């Protein structure tokens, strides 16, 4: 272990230019490249790299309309959010408004179903 500690100390004392030269020497000695694999893939064959669409993992549930039965919707909003009666009423009356933000897809679908069962209209975004 003392040898490893000495190597770490020696490497830590290198300048940037010395570290770059060491990197080149190790690449030649071991026959490897420090280049990023993405750069190698983009250079090969002239193929256009496809943009990978990131799958959305967090969703917002938006109350778009309270509907005719606002009392049931207010009760459901209170149950979902844990808000007090006044805060839930204000949220329902201010529609369109986010009821819950940054939730999983399954939870967002469940909340939307509960709101719609109470008579409201909701969207998941």
UniProtKB/Swiss-Prot annotation:
Keywords: Ribonucleoprotein, Ribosomal protein. It comes from the Bacteria. InterPro entries: Ribosomal_bL12, Ribosomal_bL12_C, Ribosomal_bL12_C/ClpS-like, Ribosomal_bL12_oligo, Ribosomal_bL12_oligo_N_sf. Signal peptide: none annotated. GO terms for cellular component: cytosolic large ribosomal subunit. GO terms for molecular function: mRNA binding; structural constituent of ribosome. GO terms for biological process: translation. It holds the Pfam family Ribosomal_L12. Forms part of the ribosomal stalk which helps the ribosome interact with GTP-bound translation factors. Is thus essential for accurate translation. Homodimer. Part of the ribosomal stalk of the 50S ribosomal subunit. Forms a multimeric L10(L12)X complex, where L10 forms an elongated spine to which 2 to 4 L12 dimers bind in a sequential fashion. Binds GTP-bound translation factors. NCBIfam families: L12. Belongs to the bacterial ribosomal protein bL12 family. HAMAP family: Ribosomal_bL12. This is Large ribosomal subunit protein bL12. The lineage of its organism: Bacteria, Pseudomonadati, Pseudomonadota, Alphaproteobacteria, Hyphomicrobiales. The gene is rplL.
């Amino acid at each position: 272990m003392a040898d490893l500690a000495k190597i770490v100390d020696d490497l830590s004392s290198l300048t940037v230019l010395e570290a770059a030269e060491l990197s080149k020497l190790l690449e030649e000695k071991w026959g490897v490249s420090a280049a990023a694999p993405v750069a190698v893939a983009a250079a090969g064959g002239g193929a256009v790299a496809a943009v990978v669409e990131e799958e959305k993992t967090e969703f917002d549930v938006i109350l778009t309309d309270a509907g005719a039965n606002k009392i049931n919707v207010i009760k459901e909003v209170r149950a979902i959010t844990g808000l007090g009666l006044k805060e839930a009423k204000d949220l329902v009356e201010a529609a369109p408004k986010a009821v819950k933000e940054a939730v999983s897809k399954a939870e967002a679908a469940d909340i939307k179903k509960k709101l719609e069962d109470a008579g409201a209209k909701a969207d998941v975004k």
